[in-house]
């Protein structure tokens, strides 16, 4: 690490607007207006929570806080405001880890982990890592639900993901829901293949019975000989 770079333990937050890509493709002015509205509404909340509004990444936000509890409380307030704002449907991820400060940016493995957790948040919800969950378990104000330990792209360590389900936040479990969808598809494929095999067997059985029936009927007939009269047209002697 460069001598001019400083590291710090922080609570890292990533946010993302659900459906923003589709909105941008259909109505770019409306998409830009939504980003401006997000900034106007949420930046004062982050500052009131003593958080750092580091940067905007497209429709997403990168924020940091001094503690996990501060980050969680602030994100709950953010979701309350977003819920009452048309089009501002957010997914939020929170993780705690060591970050390297670079001017108005941060880097580090834990920043990458936070960005990977974000997609496991429910729309309108907050997903957190096991480190953040550990800071909440002794506080009865918060309730969380374990989602699983998915393989996060570019992350070698195991990360357990939880969803905050108190404070009116949704309890959707995207990891389990995905597994259910895959299981249903697998069962449907098995049933389809089994049905196809049984259909083929049935057709072959029917053909076989038909051939046997024809063979039996033919064997019961008495063979006959057709005698054709022969006319001799040669010279008679």
Predicted regions and their residues:
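Intrinsically disordered, glycine/charged-rich C-terminal tails and inter-domain linkers
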Residues: 1, 124, 131-212
């Amino acid at each position: 690490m460069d001598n001019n770079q400083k590291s710090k333990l922080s609570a890292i937050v990533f946010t993302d607007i659900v459906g923003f890509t589709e909105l941008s493709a259909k109505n770019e002015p409306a998409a830009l207006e939504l980003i401006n509205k997000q900034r106007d509404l949420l930046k004062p909340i982050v500052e009131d929570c003593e958080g750092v509004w580091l940067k905007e990444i497209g429709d997403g936000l990168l924020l940091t806080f001094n503690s996990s509890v501060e980050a969680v409380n602030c994100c709950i307030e953010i979701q309350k405001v977003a819920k009452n704002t048309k089009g501002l449907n957010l997914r939020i991820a929170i993780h705690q880890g060591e970050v390297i400060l670079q001017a108005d940016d941060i880097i580090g493995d834990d920043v990458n982990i936070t960005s990977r957790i974000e997609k496991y948040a429910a729309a309108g919800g907050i997903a957190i890592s096991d480190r953040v969950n550990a800071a909440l378990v002794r506080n009865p104000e918060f309730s969380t639900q374990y989602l699983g330990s998915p393989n996060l792209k570019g992350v070698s360590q195991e990360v357990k993901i939880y969803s905050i389900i108190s404070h009116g936040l949704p309890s959707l479990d995207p990891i389990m829901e995905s597994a259910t969808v895959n299981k249903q598809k697998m069962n449907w494929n098995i049933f389809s293949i089994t049905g196809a095999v049984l259909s083929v067997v049935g057709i072959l059985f029917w053909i076989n019975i038909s051939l046997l029936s024809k063979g039996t009927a033919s064997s019961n007939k008495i063979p006959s000989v057709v005698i054709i009269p022969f006319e001799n047209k040669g010279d008679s002697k």
